[in-house]
């Protein structure tokens, strides 16, 4: 699939440095550049996700990692921290009625989806280590409602429920239902 071209060069030379780039991006993140940083991170993550779905079978990559021997970069603590920071920055800008509301809503949904995927992959990679798995599971359980509830506030209940469904997290889904019903009563 990769051949001798620029794709192979990228995967051999640049990809090993992705975590360093993400760490540097996180260090530079502030309110003035959050939208641009989010665009960059989402382009990278969505491109990688598309590549995995299109070519994963060729490289015998499972859709979700299942062994601790291979922890994908997108499931690293560095990537998860950056996704959460971008999510918080985007949510904050939405709360302050930023001029680019439509883009921010789209970004918030995409960041929630990518963060949930990263948490899921992180949890799957720790199955052989009970202590690490318990920590990853607890972090994921804590993050799910924090990533999904804000989607209700921006009128994206459809995305919140769609993202919650695959995780079989009944508690969060009930919270979403109750919060959504409460918002409807307020109207």
What feature does the model see in each segment?
Residues 1-187:
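Extended alpha-helical solenoid scaffolds
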